[in-house]
Amino acid sequence: GFIDDFRQSDSLVMIDPVLGDNGKLYTNFDEQMILEMRHLIRKADVITPNMTELFYLLDKPYKAENTDEELKAYLHEISEHGPGIVIITSVPVQGDPRKTSVYAYDRQGNRYWKVTCPYLPAHYPGTGDTFTSVITGSLMQGDSLPIALDRATQFILQGIRATFGYEYDNREGILLEKVLHNLDMPIQVSSYELI
């Protein structure tokens, strides 16, 4: 396939396994799509599923609340299917609906990371795509995984905050042009933690 034909030694194969959200598959997706995605992620270096997609990829029933230990087990399990780095987005923080987290596992270093940030009650299509793009750019420029997580999480939060104040059709996604310049600025290396 395409990845096998074009992969180079310095390539980074990043897959955002778009399947669903909020515990449900997207309406135009079915079981066959899940099976194909399970096959595709075997070729990835990095995957960025949200919580819903994680459970579909693992063939487990969706569970909104999970402990750090459960999430670490899920990260490790899905990593065994191929990707060396697994990043789970949109992880609710137990007991605090005003926060959300991103969890990550780096199989090579056998380390787990978590970044927690404020949750804003706004939904914009494309935030997962933007998050994955920032992670990709950060890793390609040589940032460590925790720095890439910080950069992407902060950028998405800034984008949502910048967009939230405008009378704007949410279906248009976040107003990237309002925050794009922030990618050139130093990040606050303070929000990630090793778990």
Residues covered by each model-derived region:
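Short, charged, surface-exposed loops that flank catalytic or proteolytic processing sites
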Residues: 61-71, 140-151
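Glycine-rich beta-alpha junction loops
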Residues: 19-21, 53, 90-94, 118-121, ...
